[in-house]
Curated annotation (Swiss-Prot):
The protein's name: Small ribosomal subunit protein bS16
KW Ion transport (keyword) present: no
Coiled-coil region list: none
Domain of life: Bacteria
Gene Ontology molecular-function annotations: structural constituent of ribosome
Cellular compartments per GO CC: cytoplasm; small ribosomal subunit
Acidic residues bias: start-end ranges: 142-157
UniProt cross-references to PANTHER family, sorted A to Z: 30S RIBOSOMAL PROTEIN S16, SMALL RIBOSOMAL SUBUNIT PROTEIN BS16M
Length: 157
């Protein structure tokens, strides 16, 4: 039986996701698989490629032939170089950036909400500012009157 390592398409119309599978070469693209070796998501940035290297090495060792798209993926992950004994077995796969947890995102949004604008009316702040200015003016007037009273008492003596 001729065995191929190929892609099985999943996903919606414009959002394809693929499984990397081992299947009989005569089965259709989305037919029955012998084994699932990994996934490939081309729409993510950078593309997500997760392939079980040990199982790929096994299937290549027993004679499974990769299709052209799968061969390109195996070269990116370094599995093809490892199988052939070529240099560059580490591959050129880019690491996925770490996603922030939902709890961290929630806490950041909560902190922004606490520091952001409040639901209080703006006019109350204006009134409070006027009131503070009036109180400061009243304190200054009292201080001036006290200074004048002291000056009068000293001059009367």
């Amino acid at each position: 039986m001729a065995v191929k390592i190929k892609l099985q398409r999943l996903g919606k119309i414009r959002t394809p996701h693929y499984r990397v599978i081992v299947a009989d070469s005569r089965t259709r693209r989305s037919g029955r698989a012998i084994e699932n070796l990994g996934i490939y998501e081309p729409k993510a940035d950078p593309s997500v490629i997760r392939i079980d290297s040990d199982r790929v090495q096994y299937w290549l060792g027993v004679g499974a032939q990769p299709t052209e798209p799968v061969l390109a993926l195996l070269k990116v992950t370094g599995d093809w170089q490892k199988f052939k004994g070529l240099p560059g077995a580490e591959g050129t796969l880019k690491a996925q950036p770490e996603k922030k947890s939902k709890l961290d995102l929630f806490n950041e949004a909560l902190a922004e909400a606490n520091n952001g604008p409040t639901l209080e009316a703006i006019t109350e702040k204006r009134k409070a500012a006027k009131k503070a200015a009036e109180e400061a003016a009243a304190k200054e007037a009292e201080a001036e009157e006290a200074a004048e009273d002291k000056a009068e008492e000293e001059s009367a003596e």
